[in-house]
From Swiss-Prot:
Protein name: Protein-methionine-sulfoxide reductase catalytic subunit MsrP
Keyword match Iron: no
PTMs per UniProt: Predicted to be exported by the Tat system. The position of the signal peptide cleavage has not been experimentally proven.
Keywords: Metal-binding, Molybdenum, Oxidoreductase, Periplasm, Signal
Residues spanning the signal sequence: 1-45
Gene: msrP
Cofactor note: Binds 1 Mo-molybdopterin (Mo-MPT) cofactor per subunit.
Known role: Part of the MsrPQ system that repairs oxidized periplasmic proteins containing methionine sulfoxide residues (Met-O), using respiratory chain electrons. Thus protects these proteins from oxidative-stress damage caused by reactive species of oxygen and chlorine generated by the host defense mechanisms. MsrPQ is essential for the maintenance of envelope integrity under bleach stress, rescuing a wide series of structurally unrelated periplasmic proteins from methionine oxidation.
Subunit organization: Heterodimer of a catalytic subunit (MsrP) and a heme-binding subunit (MsrQ).
Organism: Agrobacterium fabrum (strain C58 / ATCC 33970)
Single annotated GO MF: oxidoreductase activity, acting on a sulfur group of donors, quinone or similar compound as acceptor
EC code(s) of this entry: 1.8.5.-
């Protein structure tokens, strides 16, 4: 991944938390569904209604402009600004998510159906493997709720996820030389996927997901590095063996399957002991802060009892 460079954010572009919280009271699910239903058009941010989730943070939110303009989404290009600049032609509707594999009831879910799940707002830390972080108010629902619908078989041990392949709409997927193999694939153990912290997000900052942030639906696993949060999901499969994930296949020495946030296991090319929080600039720019084990979500530690987290990075 490219080296980290903190973005410049004009003060006029920063969404104050107080404004966001007051505006959220006027948001409605109907408007969100209406925008999702605009088939064949560019994604239009629309308000969503969500109940407050059980997981909250008493930390400053990352400015909305930074969340939507400083992204890794290689399907639109490898630069941090590429996803915002190059995703205008991407069509997040119509959209279906196929859930298959080792399940009793394989199904396809339209995005309109998924948007009708009881939505929660979850404010999570997001830690990128590159050494920077954000605090983002996501809107979504537990992945376990979707898995319950399809009834995984006893032989299912892992969950595999795939991003859509549309080179005509995603310029990072076209061209002779590709940075990665497509489709983008990620995976979790089934117990990780079922953990209450793991969600499928359909919005952020009170509105539907922008294209550059993974519209119309993406994975959020807050105790893992950000690249595990696969975007624009079109297929979820229950499988018996560990999925062959994209970054691990690209460079297994640098990107492991688990990729839990761990300040004690460095990336081969940089330390993971500290991070730079986007949007928190001091006199000398963005300041370093200590990285927390599991990104501060200690209740997942029991998932890895007896597992060597250095060998299984």
């Amino acid at each position: 991944m490219p080296a980290y460079r903190p973005p410049h954010i004009a003060s006029s572009e920063i969404t104050p938390k107080s404004f966001y919280l007051s505006r959220r009271n006027f948001l409605g699910t109907a408007a969100g569904l209406a925008a999702i239903g605009l088939a064949g058009r560019e994604a239009i941010a629309a308000p969503l209604s969500a109940k407050p989730g059980a997981y909250k943070l008493d930390e400053k939110l990352t400015p909305l402009d930074a969340v939507t303009s400083y992204n890794n989404f290689y399907e639109f290009g490898v630069g941090k600004s590429d996803p915002k600049e190059n995703s205008g032609k991407f069509k997040p509707t119509p959209w279906t998510v196929k859930v298959d594999g080792l399940v009793s009831k394989p199904q396809e879910f339209g995005i309109e159906e998924l948007m009708k799940y009881p939505l929660e707002e979850r404010t999570y830390r997001m830690r990128c493997v590159e050494g920077w972080s954000m605090v983002i108010p996501w809107i979504g629902f537990p992945l376990s709720a979707l898995l319950d619908k399809v009834e995984p078989l006893g032989s299912a041990k892992y969950v595999s996820f795939e991003t859509v392949v549309r080179p005509e709409e995603m310029p990072g997927q076209s061209g002779l030389f590709q940075p990665l193999s497509w489709p983008y694939v990620e995976g979790l153990r089934l117990d990780e996927a079922r953990h209450p912290l793991t969600i499928l997000a359909v919005g952020l900052y009170g509105e539907t997901l922008p294209n550059q942030n993974g519209a119309p639906i993406r994975l959020v696993v807050p105790w893992k590095y950000g690249f595990k949060g696969i975007k624009s999901i079109m297929r979820i499969s229950l499988v018996e063996k560990q999925p062959e994930t994209t970054w691990k296949n690209s460079n297994a020495r640098e990107y492991g399957f688990y990729s839990n946030v761990n300040p004690h296991v460095d990336h081969p090319r940089w330390s993971q002991a500290t991070e730079q929080r986007i949007g928190e600039g001091g006199f000398f720019g963005t300041q370093n802060r200590p990285t927390l084990m599991f990104n501060g979500y200690d209740d997942v530690a029991s998932l890895y009892t007896g597992l060597d987290l250095k060998a299984n990075y």
